[in-house]
Amino acid sequence: MEEVVAEELDDEEQLVRRHRKEKKELQAKIQGMKNAVPKNDKKRRKQLTEDVAKLEREMEQKHREELEQLKQLTFKDSKIDSVAVNISNLVLENQPPRISKAQKRREKKAALEKEREERIAEAEIENLSGARHLESEKLAQILAARELEIKQIPSDGHCMYGALEDQLREQDCALTVASLRRQTAEYMQTHSDDFLPFLTNPSTGDMYTPEEFGKYCDDIVNTAAWGGQLELRALSHILQTPIEILQADAPPIIVGEEYPRNPLVLVYMRHAYGLGEHYNSVTRLVNSATENCS
């Protein structure tokens, strides 16, 4: 009987953990949706509020149904516990009533639910006052002034190349992340004098040896190594196009200014993810006037 109860508790704990994870993922998704909509776009902000409320209602309903299903599975044991308590009361009328196993499970579930709600509330406060939220608000204002908004790129180590791939796609240039990485490494290897002086061994502080530089270029091609300004400089020469990097707390950076084409525009975010810096692409802002005319 004790083994059965342990299994039921494990099932309930697993369900609560899964619900907690799904709530966390939903909050991250909602934050991404909020970041993508400029603060001054009232129409889209209103629609966003409705969409967020709908997502939260649907998840809450789903979680209630799953908890109810689990409760039904344990209903039989609860009835057995209740009968056992009643028999005990008949035999030992003066004995104080005991808390049933089902009641203990309900109390434990309520405590876990309260803890989860407190964590969500703390996370919401942190999001609204933290560096990530402030950075997103500043970037939204900068982009809105240009009639642009952020286009999210996955944070998988390829984000800089992925953002450029997206920008090039808008110009009908079908270069993939893999192709951009390969061409970057090849350009840096054939122009090593332009890049080698800026690369140092983090352990010794010495400039990279030719062997270390070769491995650096191999990693560009064969791993999800994060790209930075050296790689952007190489890509601007490869594409013969300027690349403009917008950021929240500093003026824009433009590499490849010597080229006369319209720049590819990236957004650099220092606080977007806990693991470090991140690049996103941009897209044209669809304002309320355009929507009303369509």
Curated annotation (Swiss-Prot):
<keyword id="KW-0378">Hydrolase</keyword>
<keyword id="KW-0007">Acetylation</keyword>
<dbReference type="GO" id="GO:0004843">
    <property type="term" value="F:cysteine-type deubiquitinase activity"/>
</dbReference>
<feature type="active site">
    <location>
        <position position="156"/>
    </location>
</feature>
<dbReference type="Pfam" id="PF02338">
    <property type="entry name" value="OTU"/>
</dbReference>
<feature type="region of interest" description="Cys-loop">
    <location>
        <begin position="153"/>
        <end position="159"/>
    </location>
</feature>
<feature type="region of interest" description="His-loop">
    <location>
        <begin position="268"/>
        <end position="278"/>
    </location>
</feature>
<dbReference type="InterPro" id="IPR050704">
    <property type="entry name" value="Peptidase_C85-like"/>
</dbReference>
<dbReference type="GO" id="GO:0043248">
    <property type="term" value="P:proteasome assembly"/>
</dbReference>
<feature type="region of interest" description="Variable-loop">
    <location>
        <begin position="220"/>
        <end position="230"/>
    </location>
</feature>
<feature type="active site">
    <location>
        <position position="278"/>
    </location>
</feature>
<keyword id="KW-0788">Thiol protease</keyword>
<feature type="domain" description="OTU">
    <location>
        <begin position="148"/>
        <end position="285"/>
    </location>
</feature>
<dbReference type="InterPro" id="IPR003323">
    <property type="entry name" value="OTU_dom"/>
</dbReference>
<keyword id="KW-0833">Ubl conjugation pathway</keyword>
<protein>
    <recommendedName>
        <fullName>Deubiquitinase OTUD6B</fullName>
        <ecNumber>3.4.19.12</ecNumber>
    </recommendedName>
</protein>
<dbReference type="GO" id="GO:0006508">
    <property type="term" value="P:proteolysis"/>
</dbReference>
<dbReference type="GO" id="GO:0016579">
    <property type="term" value="P:protein deubiquitination"/>
</dbReference>
<keyword id="KW-0645">Protease</keyword>
<comment type="function">
    <text>Deubiquitinating enzyme that may play a role in the ubiquitin-dependent regulation of protein synthesis, downstream of mTORC1. May associate with the protein synthesis initiation complex and modify its ubiquitination to repress translation. May also repress DNA synthesis and modify different cellular targets thereby regulating cell growth and proliferation. May also play a role in proteasome assembly and function.</text>
</comment>
<feature type="modified residue" description="N-acetylmethionine">
    <location>
        <position position="1"/>
    </location>
</feature>
<comment type="subunit">
    <text>Interacts with the eukaryotic translation initiation factor 4F complex.</text>
</comment>
<feature type="active site" description="Nucleophile">
    <location>
        <position position="159"/>
    </location>
</feature>
<dbReference type="InterPro" id="IPR049772">
    <property type="entry name" value="OTU_OTUD6"/>
</dbReference>
<dbReference type="InterPro" id="IPR038765">
    <property type="entry name" value="Papain-like_cys_pep_sf"/>
</dbReference>
